[in-house]
């Protein structure tokens, strides 16, 4: 496998330019690789279970682009430092990928980078732990394709007794999108 294979553009059907339902939130993530004797490993983090937003989720380091961030890349590097204590000099940026507009209103700016080693990682309160998966494993395994529904549901204070509200149980999903699921046991 060569670097071109790793950095190949996403197929067109995986990109979305659909209109979003919420205010746009610009975010940036780092897709970190670690080079080792066996090839390249992809580094993931597991978010702390104490977080209010997506606790326990598996993710890449990243987050909202702050006003102090000069560029989306600066945000991705800052977030990686905040979450994993990896200093900027231990991050070698390889490429930027096309921004991805999500149905939830996040514009994601991804950057592929090599980080020096797992020994440099010191998880902060935002991250429970990290793990790596050999890139070769992804090349050898097909993901499951699962549907997610984005729907509008009334909150606890929504007045369902007024005539125009109708039966909230009859409200339908507004958008279906697909997610790829890999089940790695390593």
Task: Identify the function of each model-found stretch.
Residues 1-59, 64-119, 127, 136, ...:
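N-terminal leader/linker segments that precede catalytic domains of diphosphate-processing enzymes
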Residues 124-131:
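Phosphate/pyrophosphate-binding betaalpha-module
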Residues 132, 138:
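Sequence-specific DNA-binding recognition helix
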Residues 139-149:
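Short acidic, Gly/Pro-enriched loop/turn segments at secondary-structure junctions
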């Amino acid at each position: 496998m060569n670097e071109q294979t790793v950095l190949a553009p996403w197929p067109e059907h995986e990109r979305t330019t659909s209109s979003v339902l919420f205010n746009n939130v610009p975010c940036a993530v780092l897709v970190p690789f670690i080079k080792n004797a066996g090839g390249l490993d992809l580094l993931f983090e597991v978010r702390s279970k104490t977080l209010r937003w997506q606790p326990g989720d598996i993710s890449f380091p990243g987050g909202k682009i702050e006003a102090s961030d000069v560029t989306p890349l600066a945000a991705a590097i800052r977030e990686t430092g905040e979450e994993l204590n990896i200093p900027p000099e231990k991050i070698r940026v390889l490429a930027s990928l096309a921004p991805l507009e999500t149905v939830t209103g996040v514009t994601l700016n991804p950057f592929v980078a090599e980080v020096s080693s797992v020994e440099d990682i010191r998880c902060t309160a935002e991250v429970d732990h990290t793990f790596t998966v050999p890139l070769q494993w992804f090349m050898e395994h097909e993901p499951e394709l699962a549907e997610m529904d984005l729907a509008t549901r009334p909150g606890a204070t929504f007045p369902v007794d007024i005539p125009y509200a109708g039966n909230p149980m009859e409200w339908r999903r507004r958008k279906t999108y697909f997610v790829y699921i890999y089940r790695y046991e390593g």
